[in-house]
UniProtKB/Swiss-Prot annotation:
The modification Phosphoserine is found at S72, S199, S321, S326, S337, S659. Residues 281-295, 312-321, 336-358, 633-648 have a biased composition (Basic and acidic residues). The keyword Hydrolase does not apply. GO terms for molecular function: DNA binding; double-stranded DNA binding; histone deacetylase binding; NF-kappaB binding; protein kinase A regulatory subunit binding; zinc ion binding. Its main location: nucleus. Belongs to the AKAP95 family. Anchoring protein that mediates the subcellular compartmentation of cAMP-dependent protein kinase (PKA type II). Acts as an anchor for a PKA-signaling complex onto mitotic chromosomes, which is required for maintenance of chromosomes in a condensed form throughout mitosis. Recruits condensin complex subunit NCAPD2 to chromosomes required for chromatin condensation; the function appears to be independent from PKA-anchoring. May help to deliver cyclin D/E to CDK4 to facilitate cell cycle progression. Required for cell cycle G2/M transition and histone deacetylation during mitosis. There is a cross-link at K315, K563 (Glycyl lysine isopeptide (Lys-Gly) (interchain with G-Cter in SUMO2)). The gene is Akap8. This is A-kinase anchor protein 8. Residues 572-589 are annotated as: Required for interaction with MYCBP.
Length: 687
């Protein structure tokens, strides 16, 4: 038997027929191995009427290739042996589509395995697909022309012999000659691969449950494992010398591969298995600026501005070519170059000036921030003077009832009990008395301030917020242990109180709080002034009767605080005294800030003779400065009588020795105002 091609064949038409119709009898099939693709057919085959792919039409030719079967009468059949193809691919596709229309109208059962008829019922737009020959597998009685010979995972009425799946890399081939698979795939790829869709070759890497098969690949009856393994169009894949496919053969929907990219077809035939990128995607690549300049001739070349010296060189070269070079041109060029050099120096100087201005601005910002810190610190200290507080428990409140409840609470007593395990009982009792006495003095100070000036109404934080902002005023509780805000509802509060996380965090916070309270108590007792008071308390005396100054020492404020010079201490104390602690409490912190700024400017060691002509005023300032400096530096004052002696002893040696004493000269302060501030300083605690 001669060389055969398993792609084209002839169909019996029953009686003599010159129209090339197809018979429906299964027994009328002749093996397709008798038809040679390049040579004449066997003489045992009756004469038929072959249809050619010529450019004229589908008219029957006079070629005689023999009968279909032995003993049968001579008849005209349609042979699909292609003649030398001189037409372009579009005309061939049009003729194939015309034949497919004829087949879809007749609808005979001849085992025709072309998938174009099946696609005719689904979508008429897909009938413009490459025509595929009949598969060389044995015909089955239940085979219909609307079912392709291969199977997807769709719910077709598959027989027992057509249970192959498209999900694997290779199909479950039922061909009685499986060794012909690779060769048939190669021949089919060369014979019809030129009409195949560019994006079909990407379907072999799909997974069936998630990626639907391409619509353009359904009419093909060839085993997809063979076509895709060979690269979709044969072993070489697509090449540039082949004509482009027809416009109708392109896929109507974009084809996506497993990498999520459109059109993973062959790319110049260089990538195996058809995994290269589609050629239609080349113009979709992002074009970056300067990317095209990289090449063998210009590697990494960037666009540069012309340097300053190129302009006179160019002018000189042009003058040489013209032959009229003169000294004036050279002088002009030199002047231009000099001007450009001076311009460059000016730019450099300007940049330096800008850097200097930025540095000056940074210094101004630093000074401004430092002033703001001082204002905030003064405001906080002024607020602390009129705020009830328990230093050991770190409890603060502006309400007298709340501090009284705290001093009688279980939490406060447990804290003192824990401190008593580390310190003597008498010392713990002294701490309790000290806290109570301090809060009494704070209450007295608050009453005095309220008598002087009536409290200003508190500004409403919700002022200017309307209903269009959808704000609502609510009450909430802040859990310090869990750092959470809980709406003030009984059910929500109880739920949080009985939660496991809250109980765990509460126990941890209580342990940490006890350790902190012990540290604060030790810091308070380490103060020299408190030590003197503790000694009197242990002797049975009352250190809180007729006390000149109430010196509150907070452990957390003493820790890590930098030591200040006497001049700075005096300036801060005088500023606090002048503000009278009233304006800062009511939110008017600007006057205090102004006084602090004035004091900061004039602070420094000043001789007593330069303070003023009035000796009485200088004496008052001298006594006030020495007193406040000694009080603020770690609370070195003694009791009321000892404090007066200390002031006299400190003032006399300073005046006798003539050493510079820090005195602050504040203009605009009269003698009666100084006396008033001196009286207030005795009742105002400093920190």
């Amino acid at each position: 038997m001669e060389q055969s091609y398993g792609g084209y064949g002839a169909w019996s038409a029953g009686p003599a027929n010159t129209q090339g119709t197809y018979g429906s009898g299964v027994a009328s099939w002749q093996g397709y191995e008798n038809y040679s693709y390049y040579n004449a057919q066997n003489t045992s085959v009756p004469t038929g009427t072959p249809y050619s792919y010529g450019p004229a039409s589908w008219e029957a030719t006079k070629a005689s290739d023999g009968g279909l079967a032995a003993g049968s009468s001579a008849m005209h059949v349609a042979s699909f042996a292609p003649e030398p193809c001189t037409d372009n691919s579009d005309s061939l596709i049009a003729k194939i589509n015309q034949r497919l229309d004829m087949l879809s109208k007749e609808g005979g059962r001849g085992g025709i395995s072309s998938g174009g008829e099946g696609m005719q019922d689904r979508d008429s737009s897909f009938r413009f697909q490459p025509y595929e020959s009949y598969d060389s597998r044995p015909c089955m009685p239940e085979h219909t022309p609307y079912r392709p010979s291969y199977s997807y995972d769709y719910d077709f009425d598959l027989g027992t012999d057509r249970n192959g799946s498209f999900g694997g890399t290779f199909n479950d081939c039922r061909d009685p000659t499986p060794e012909r698979g690779a060769l048939d795939g190669f021949l089919r790829g060369r014979g019809q691969g030129r009409f195949q869709d560019r994006s079909n070759s990407s379907t072999f890497i799909r997974s069936d449950p998630f990626m639907p098969p391409s619509a353009s690949s359904e009419p093909l009856s060839t085993t997809w494992s063979e076509l895709n393994y060979m690269g979709g169009r044969g072993l070489g894949g697509p090449s540039t010398n082949r004509p482009p496919p027809s416009l109708f053969s392109q896929s109507m929907a974009p084809d996506y591969s497993m990498m999520g990219m459109q059109g993973v077809g062959g790319f110049g035939g260089t990538m195996p298995y058809g995994c290269g990128r589609s050629q239609t995607r080349i113009r979709d690549w992002p074009r970056r600026r300067g990317f095209e300049r990289f090449g063998p001739d210009n590697m990494g070349r960037k666009r540069k501005p012309f340097p300053l010296y190129e302009e006179p060189d160019a002018k000189l070269a042009r003058a040489d070519s013209e032959g009229d070079l003169s000294e004036n041109d050279d002088g002009a060029g030199d002047l231009r170059s000099g001007d450009e050099e001076f311009r460059g120096e000016d730019d450099l100087c300007d940049s330096r000036k800008q850097r200097g201005e930025k540095e000056d601005e940074d210094e101004d910002v630093k000074k401004r921030r430092e002033k703001q810190r001082r204002r905030d610190r003064m405001r906080d200290r002024a607020a602390d003077r009129i705020q009830f507080a328990c230093s050991v428990c770190k409890f603060r409140s502006f309400e007298d009832e709340e501090i009284q409840k705290h001093l009688q609470s279980k939490f406060h007593k447990e804290t003192l009990r824990f401190i008593s395990t580390k310190l003597p009982d008498k010392t713990v009792e002294f701490l309790q008395e000290y806290i109570i006495n301090r809060n009494k003095k704070i209450e007295k100070r608050r009453q005095e301030l309220l008598e002087k000036e009536s409290p200003k109404p508190k500004p409403d934080p919700f002022k200017g917020i309307g209903q269009e902002h959808f704000f609502k005023r609510i009450e909430a509780a802040h859990c310090l242990a869990c750092d959470m805000l809980i709406p003030a509802q009984h059910q929500l509060l109880q739920r949080h109180l009985h939660s496991v996380d809250h109980n765990h965090n509460r126990r941890l916070a209580a342990e940490q709080f006890k350790k902190t309270s012990l540290h604060v108590a030790k810091s308070v007792l380490n103060n020299k002034h408190i030590v003197k008071m503790l000694e009197k308390y242990l002797k049975g005396e009352d250190p809180f009767v007729n006390e000149t100054a109430d010196l509150e020492t907070e452990g957390d404020e003493n820790l890590g605080e930098e030591k200040e010079t006497p001049e700075e201490v005096a300036a801060e104390v005088l500023a606090e005294v002048i503000t009278a602690a009233v304006k800062a409490v009511e939110g008017d912190g600007e006057p205090a800030a102004e006084h602090s700024d004035v004091l900061a400017e004039v602070e420094g060691p000043v001789d007593t003779a330069e303070a003023g002509s009035d000796s009485h005023t200088g004496k008052l300032l001298e006594e006030q400065t020495c007193e406040t400096a000694s009080e603020t530096r770690n609370m070195e004052d003694m009791a009321r009588g000892e404090a007066a002696e200390a002031r006299n002893e400190a003032a006399v040696p300073a005046a006798a020795a003539g050493s510079p004493v820090p005195v602050i000269a504040i203009p605009g302060i009269l003698e009666d105002e100084l006396e008033q501030t001196d009286a207030e300083a005795k009742d105002t605690p400093t920190e």
